[in-house]
């Protein structure tokens, strides 16, 4: 089978390419240039070239910087401007890795696209990885349903430690087993505020309000805060911990309250991405990558919006983040929180 492998220069994509080549497939590597971080690509391309030479496979360098800027980077900035919390990895998977890269794979005549994600596929549904600590099904849940039939995730049945051990047994790949893992958001060096600083003044002080609308303190600029944050702002007249409940970007205000006030039992989604045919779902939902799943009921409307009712309340639901719905270990839907 002719397979395009997304190669980043990391251990996961390297072992993915190695495994597929060893199974006798016709493997082609592809490195994506997504952003202009200095020296970032040069180092990674050297690693990809080293692996490609070792495996004796051709590789391509695909410049997707413009697409990435329009579909991932600027939406990241704009979402924070709106006082919401973005999910750039979900957008990147949908539009870039499982969008533009898949399109490139088809143009090369490849039957499949393989990535180093920790996830599995079963009956055209994304399934959680064997290694639960590294499972990436949450981020892949934004994928277009039609893309799934072209995908392969060779590491889905492996534990991360076994992937590293496997790489360390092969002389040429030993260095890949010990290299530092990449950060979750590839274009953020230290903090997301450093990215926002390039586009706006993030340090304009504003008012802190309680849930009744009373001014109780000051903050250092609304973009420094996300829902649930409990530090970095002033609250006068109380010793009880306070958390960010809401952000008003136009007024440069943050509304804070007690942990009890963070509780939410219902929320809405826009543009639900369904992997099964349904008008209602009785399932479990994850409201952020590292959160535990919570039982819920989902009502889906004609305009693809949805209302979610949780069995147990959750704390700190952030608008802009992705909610991912599971039936046991399979992803059945996803959508962005209103």
Curated annotation (Swiss-Prot):
Which residues does the annotation list for site: Interaction with tRNA? Answer: 117, 321
Give its localization.
Answer: Cytoplasm
Gene3D superfamilies, alphabetically? Adenine nucleotide alpha hydrolases-like domains, HUPs, Translation factors
GO cellular component terms listed in the entry, alphabetical order: cytoplasm
Q: Which reaction does it catalyse?
A: S-sulfanyl-L-cysteinyl-[protein] + uridine(34) in tRNA + AH2 + ATP = 2-thiouridine(34) in tRNA + L-cysteinyl-[protein] + A + AMP + diphosphate + H(+)
**Keywords for this protein:** ATP-binding, Cytoplasm, Disulfide bond, Nucleotide-binding, RNA-binding, Transferase, tRNA processing, tRNA-binding
Paired cysteines (S-S): 92-186
Give the matching SUPFAM superfamilies.
Adenine nucleotide alpha hydrolases-like
Task: Give the EC class as a word.
Answer: transferase
Q: Which GO molecular function entries does the Swiss-Prot or TrEMBL record give?
A: ATP binding; tRNA binding; tRNA-uridine 2-sulfurtransferase activity
UniProt region (Interaction with tRNA), positions on chain: 134-136, 288-289
Q: Which GO terms describe its biological process?
A: tRNA wobble position uridine thiolation
A Pfam family cross-referenced in the UniProt record is tRNA_Me_trans_M
Question: Where does the chain bind ATP?
Answer: 6-13, 32, 116
The residues responsible for catalysis, as annotated, are 92, 186
Per the UniProt entry, the Enzyme Commission number(s) are 2.8.1.13
The superkingdom listed in its UniProt entry is Bacteria
For the keyword Disulfide bond, the answer is yes
Question: Which HAMAP family has this protein been placed in?
Answer: tRNA_thiouridyl_MnmA
Q: What is the role of the protein in this entry?
A: Catalyzes the 2-thiolation of uridine at the wobble position (U34) of tRNA, leading to the formation of s(2)U34.
Q: Which family does it belong to?
A: Belongs to the MnmA/TRMU family.
Q: Which NCBIfam families match?
A: PRK00143.1 (NF001138), trmU (TIGR00420)
Protein name, entry field: tRNA-specific 2-thiouridylase MnmA
- Which organism was this protein described from? Campylobacter jejuni subsp. doylei (strain ATCC BAA-1458 / RM4099 / 269.97)
């Amino acid at each position: 089978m002719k397979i395009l492998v997304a190669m980043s220069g990391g251990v996961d994509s390297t072992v993915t390419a190695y495994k597929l080549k060893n199974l006798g497939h016709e493997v082609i590597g592809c490195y994506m240039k997504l952003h202009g971080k200095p020296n970032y690509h040069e180092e990674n391309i050297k690693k990809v070239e080293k692996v490609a030479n070792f495996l004796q496979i051709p590789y391509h360098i695909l410049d997707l910087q413009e697409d990435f800027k329009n579909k991932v980077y600027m939406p990241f900035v704009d979402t924070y401007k709106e006082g919401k919390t973005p999910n750039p990895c979900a957008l990147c998977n949908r539009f870039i890795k499982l969008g533009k890269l898949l399109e490139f794979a088809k143009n090369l005549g490849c039957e499949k696209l393989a990535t180093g994600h920790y996830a599995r596929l079963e009956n055209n549904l994304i399934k959680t990885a064997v290694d639960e600590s590294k499972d990436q099904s949450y981020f892949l849940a934004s994928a277009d349903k039609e893309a799934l039939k072209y995908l392969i995730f060779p590491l889905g049945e492996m534990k991360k430690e076994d992937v590293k051990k496997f790489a360390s047994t092969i002389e040429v790949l030993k260095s890949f087993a010990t290299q530092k893992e990449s950060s979750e958001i590839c274009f953020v060096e230290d903090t997301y505020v450093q990215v926002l600083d390039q586009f706006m003044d993030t340090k304009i002080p504003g008012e802190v309000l309680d849930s009744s609308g009373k001014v109780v303190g000051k903050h250092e600029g609304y973009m420094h805060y996300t829902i649930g944050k409990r530090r970095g702002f002033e609250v006068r007249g109380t010793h009880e911990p306070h958390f960010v409940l809401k952000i008003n970007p136009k007024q440069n205000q943050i509304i804070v309250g007690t942990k009890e006030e963070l509780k939410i039992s219902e929320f809405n989604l826009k543009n639900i991405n369904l992997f099964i045919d349904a008008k209602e779902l009785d399932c479990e939902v994850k409201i952020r990558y590292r959160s535990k799943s919570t039982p819920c009921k989902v009502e889906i409307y004609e305009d693809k919006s949805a209302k979610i009712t949780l069995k147990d309340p959750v704390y700190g639901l952030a608008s802009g983040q992705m909610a991912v719905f599971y039936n046991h270990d399979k992803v059945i839907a996803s959508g962005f929180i209103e």
